[in-house]
């Protein structure tokens, strides 16, 4: 879901709301 935190390969976690 878009409201779930996405984990990127650079180690940064971005939450798309």
Curated annotation (Swiss-Prot):
Major subcellular site: membrane
Described purpose of this protein according to its UniProt entry: J region of the variable domain of T cell receptor (TR) beta chain that participates in the antigen recognition. Alpha-beta T cell receptors are antigen specific receptors which are essential to the immune response and are present on the cell surface of T lymphocytes. Recognize peptide-major histocompatibility (MH) (pMH) complexes that are displayed by antigen presenting cells (APC), a prerequisite for efficient T cell adaptive immunity against pathogens.
Protein's name in the database: T cell receptor beta joining 1-6
Subunit structure: Alpha-beta TR is a heterodimer composed of an alpha and beta chain; disulfide-linked. The alpha-beta TR is associated with the transmembrane signaling CD3 coreceptor proteins to form the TR-CD3 (TcR or TCR). The assembly of alpha-beta TR heterodimers with CD3 occurs in the endoplasmic reticulum where a single alpha-beta TR heterodimer associates with one CD3D-CD3E heterodimer, one CD3G-CD3E heterodimer and one CD247 homodimer forming a stable octameric structure. CD3D-CD3E and CD3G-CD3E heterodimers preferentially associate with TR alpha and TR beta chains, respectively.
GO biological process: adaptive immune response
Species per Swiss-Prot/TrEMBL record: Homo sapiens
Key words, A-Z: Adaptive immunity, Cell membrane, Immunity, Membrane, Receptor, T cell receptor
UniProt subcellular location: Cell membrane
GO cellular component: T cell receptor complex
